[in-house]
Amino acid sequence: LIKLTIKDARLNAGLTQARMSELLEIPKRTIGDWETGTRKPPAYVEKLVIRELERIAEENNSK
């Protein structure tokens, strides 16, 4: 099982960091820090964010 990263999930959803920031109400800088490894979100936050990005990706693919 390959673990999906927040960045992978964001790209799969077709979102920029700025758009993800708007949709999920997470500061853009925080998203950037997570993606570069400068900061690591708590595991539960990472799971919730990835789950939401997967939902957005499914919505976008069904249009």
For the regions a protein language model found, what residue spans apply to each?
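Short basic helix-loop element that most often maps to the first helix and adjoining turn
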Residues: 5-19, 48
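Key DNA-contacting residues within the recognition helix of helix-turn-helix
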Residues: 7, 32-33, 42, 50
